[in-house]
Amino acid sequence: MGFLKLIEIENFKSYKGRQIIGPFQRFTAIIGPNGSGKSNLMDAISFVLGEKTSNLRVKTLRDLIHGAPVGKPAANRAFVSMVYSEEGAEDRTFARVIVGGSSEYKINNKVVQLHEYSEELEKLGILIKARNFLVFQGAVESIAMKNPKERTALFEEISRSGELAQEYDKRKKEMVKAEEDTQFNYHRKKNIAAERKEAKQEKEEADRYQRLKDEVVRAQVQLQLFKLYHNEVEIEKLNKELASKNKEIEKDKKRMDKVEDELKEKKKELGKMMREQQQIEKEIKEKDSELNQKRPQYIKAKENTSHKIKKLEAAKKSLQNAQKHYKKRKGDMDELEKEMLSVEKARQEFEERMEEESQSQGRDLTLEENQVKKYHRLKEEASKRAATLAQELEKFNRDQKADQDRLDLEERKKVETEAKIKQKLREIEENQKRIEKLEEYITTSKQSLEEQKKLEGELTEEVEMAKRRIDEINKELNQVMEQLGDARIDRQESSRQQRKAEIMESIKRLYPGSVYGRLIDLCQPTQKKYQIAVTKVLGKNMDAIIVDSEKTGRDCIQYIKEQRGEPETFLPLDYLEVKPTDEKLRELKGAKLVIDVIRYEPPHIKKALQYACGNALVCDNVEDARRIAFGGHQRHKTVALDGTLFQKSGVISGGASDLKAKARRWDEKAVDKLKEKKERLTEELKEQMKAKRKEAELRQVQSQAHGLQMRLKYSQSDLEQTKTRHLALNLQEKSKLESELANFGPRINDIKRIIQSREREMKDLKEKMNQVEDEVFEEFCREIGVRNIREFEEEKVKRQNEIAKKRLEFENQKTRLGIQLDFEKNQLKEDQDKVHMWEQTVKKDENEIEKLKKEEQRHMKIIDETMAQLQDLKNQHLAKKSEVNDKNHEMEEIRKKLGGANKEMTHLQKEVTAIETKLEQKRSDRHNLLQACKMQDIKLPLSKGTMDDISQEEGSSQGEDSVSGSQRTSNIYAREALIEIDYGDLCEDLKDAQAEEEIKQEMNTLQQKLNEQQSVLQRIAAPNMKAMEKLESVRDKFQETSDEFEAARKRAKKAKQAFEQIKKERFDRFNACFESVATNIDEIYKALSRNSSAQAFLGPENPEEPYLDGINYNCVAPGKRFRPMDNLSGGEKTVAALALLFAIHSYKPAPFFVLDEIDAALDNTNIGKVANYIKEQSTCNFQAIVISLKEEFYTKAESLIGVYPEQGDCVISKVLTFDLTKYPDANPNPNEQ
């Protein structure tokens, strides 16, 4: 058996440079401190044996180069080589080199591909993917903690059955799908076989059904031929009768044309008059509109004049105020000028007096030259003696001058403050006057605004009321027009009704209180639903005229005859015989007395209503009406809500469409009232439109009110600003100035007290200085004849100072007065400009008022003229309206003539209409019969035309105007009239039937026979008429499905075979490994435990396919009962995991086994057991290379490889090799040393 002999490393991880490690013995231990690089040596062995980079604790291959992790790679390449030795064979070298970012593989220094490299290693029993040659650090604990599923994955990896998992899953899916397809096609084939059987039965039923259907068709043709034959006979008869009546109508038409021509002429004249009347109405409307436009202009002109007058009054007041200010300012300025003249005069008088005093003083103090020198010398000497005093006096003088300047400044400020206070007082006065003026203007504006608002409110109310009323009138007019439109009274009928209404009014006037009116006008059904029923019961009595007596009725009939009116029915209340109402009928359920569902007025016409209604009952439906009429022992007259009437005699009459039209007359009797309402509303609408036209005037007033409101707002804002800003600010500044003025007095007095006090001190100093001067100048004073030297100096200097001071006072007064005078002049000019401005404003406003008054008068004149023209037009309109009424009366007389002719024409037209209606009905019946034959696919025998010539009526589109519905129907009838039917198949007995009852009896017989045949046909469930086609289709489908089923069955068989093949291969791989491990594990566990009572066994959860489920692993520790793996102690678990690990390794064992710290979790006892086991196995089964930190373990090895670190930029690992075979068990316990 071969073994790993040497490892050569160059710049790999912590191993810098080239290092040769080895030789490795059968049991070699790698030892060294933590962090020295022991695991890196294991990584080197893994690397050279082809392990992936990700399992070497780095991200990229470059990181394996020494120094690369700290950014200082020792070289750009690294490599690891392994020398493998076998007995009787040459050593082989396997090397893996890092070049750039990839690996290069070499065998005996020859570069090979990775797959060749892997194959060579596999030949030696080294499986790269299964990693059967190494155990990483922590792998033992990981194996101990694995669950059954994870153990299965481990076995899949070791046995390489996992490589077949993807192909296994794929083939299993294909097999399942193929089996599903086979099952689907089997069921489909079974279903189609059932369909084939069902189709055969359907075909037999269809043949029988077709025979019965042919018999029904023959009976239908016979019935339809019978109906059509007698229909055509009736149409021919009606056509002859219609032609005769049309000739009579032509004669009456010619007679009516003459009367109508006369009526047309009158209409033209009436039309002309009405157009003239409309023109006058148009002119009235235009003048009215013009007047409505002019009135706002007049109001605006009047408002402008009023506004300008108010403005003028305000300007005059402003002018008066400005003139008052100007006079006051002029007086103040005159006073200042007088004061200026007074000061100038005083100054001149002072100058003159000084001149006189100068001349009057004759004394001359002029010195000689030697005396002057002496004076200066003595003066210098005196100055030296009094130098100290002079310095003190100079200091006092400086202080005194500073205080005097302060005093002058305060007095000047005081004067300026007094002037400012006067100015503020004037401004305050102006502010107060402006406030008074603004308050007066605001009061006036508010009054004007109230007036405008009042006027606006009145106009708004009037216009809004007019708008609302116009909307209401328009709504009412629309309702009236809709109701009038719904009445659908044609022109002739309207004229007839108008004629009858006029006669009715005439006889009411002739016999007041005796003629009550028509029955329809005096009563009304309580609910709309009873209208048709009440109409049916009242019948012809609806239009009967109710009178109080028979005599009144006869007189009325005579009057109608004289007026050539239509015949009328009269119901005299004293002549009618009425049976009393049967009170028992009121107790019947589902019925009411007709008289109880009618309201009537006046009460005494009840007799006439009882006569018309009798004891008739109204019911909700036809069934109730029939039941009550004929169902009891006594018959009653009843009527349903739809108008179906059941007479006691047994006669039943239906609610025809003309009855509904007649029932609408309950609503039509309000037409006259609606017309009157329409006229009244139209007139009111015109009046309201006039009021609505005042909107322009309202907008004008609103605009003026808005302008006035804005001016008022600005004035109020100005007033508020003047009060709160200008006046308040001036008062505040005045108060501040007065406060400052009050402070000037104390400050000036304080300065004056300081100056007076200092003057006293200066006086004392001067006296001391004077004593020194007197001593020095004593002899000199005697020489010049003065008491002391000061008398000489003061005479000359004092006078000059006094004069200068006095002149300064005069100048100050003139300057102050000049400043005030300049200010007053400027203010006076401003006041004069204001006076001039207000004078111009007053003059301009007066001129504008004159113009505005003229404009106001001009608008007033236009309004008066327009109103006069409007009144003239209204008079013309009344005259023209009278002419139109007269012309209407003339036309009414002609209409009466036309009415007589129209009556005869109407009678004939009614007869023609009746014939045409019957004829139209017969044509419609023929059309319906033909259409029914076409729709029911009844093939009639035709001698001319085809069934395609029979038309089906379709509704015309909304936009179709070319052909009306009736015209289209006529075209259809005409086209169908060309169809000739061959009645040869119709029995002669059926053709000979003439009487209506006979025809009806024969038709019922034919219909009954047809019904019996159809009943038999209907009882047979409609078969599938396409049964033959279905049968052929099902046969084809059955053959197709059988083919598909056979193909699916073959595919399923093939897929199952393919799956079984891959399943077997996967099972064989897995089972070979599992059986090997399961067989060896118990023996290995006993050897590791050093006890034959220890047991270990593996069991698959799924014996048939163990790789699909988990693998259970259980151990019984020596001297203990069976417990699950989870309940074993840490050491026991580790020993069990090692047993599994060594058992797995025993399956296709690698020649060497590299283990990284497998003793980490073992106690000393178990360490010894494991070490001894490994030592035993290494002698015969495999070479063991173990990384360990425990002496109890590595002392059992044959050689030691020691790894120690050296410090540099990163850790550098160095290696020492120590052969222990030279010291066999010399020191079994090194700790004793």
UniProtKB/Swiss-Prot annotation:
GO cellular component terms, semicolon-separated: kinetochore; meiotic cohesin complex; nuclear lumen; nucleus
Biased composition (Low complexity): 953-967
Reported effect, S957A: No effect on interaction with RPGR
UniProt key word Coiled coil: yes
Domain SMC hinge: 515-629
One of the protein's GO biological processes: response to DNA damage checkpoint signaling
Segments of skewed composition (Basic and acidic residues): 284-293
UniProtKB keywords: Acetylation, ATP-binding, Cell cycle, Cell division, Centromere, Chromosome, Coiled coil, DNA damage, DNA repair, Meiosis, Mitosis, Nucleotide-binding, Nucleus, Phosphoprotein, Ubl conjugation
Location within or outside the cell: Nucleus; Chromosome; Chromosome, Centromere
Modified residues (N6-acetyllysine): K648, K713, K1037
Keyword Ion transport: no
Molecular function in Gene Ontology: ATP binding; ATP hydrolysis activity; chromatin binding; DNA binding
List of residues binding ATP: G32, P33, N34, G35, S36, G37, K38, S39
Oligomer and partners: Forms a heterodimer with SMC3 in cohesin complexes. Cohesin complexes are composed of the SMC1 (SMC1A or meiosis-specific SMC1B) and SMC3 heterodimer attached via their SMC hinge domain, RAD21 which link them, and one STAG protein (STAG1, STAG2 or meiosis-specific STAG3), which interacts with RAD21. In germ cell cohesin complexes, SMC1A is mutually exclusive with SMC1B. Found in a complex with CDCA5, SMC3 and RAD21, PDS5A/SCC-112 and PDS5B/APRIN. Interacts with NDC80, SYCP2, STAG3, BRCA1 and BRAT1.
Comment text on domains: The flexible SMC hinge domain, which separates the large intramolecular coiled coil regions, allows the heterotypic interaction with the corresponding domain of SMC3, forming a V-shaped heterodimer. The two heads of the heterodimer are then connected by different ends of the cleavable RAD21 protein, forming a ring structure.
Biological function: Involved in chromosome cohesion during cell cycle and in DNA repair. Involved in DNA repair via its interaction with BRCA1 and its related phosphorylation by ATM, and works as a downstream effector in the ATM/NBS1 branch of S-phase checkpoint. Central component of cohesin complex. The cohesin complex is required for the cohesion of sister chromatids after DNA replication. The cohesin complex apparently forms a large proteinaceous ring within which sister chromatids can be trapped. At anaphase, the complex is cleaved and dissociates from chromatin, allowing sister chromatids to segregate.
Family: Belongs to the SMC family. SMC1 subfamily.
Name of the protein in its database record: Structural maintenance of chromosomes protein 1A
Species whose genome carries this gene: Bos taurus (Bovine)
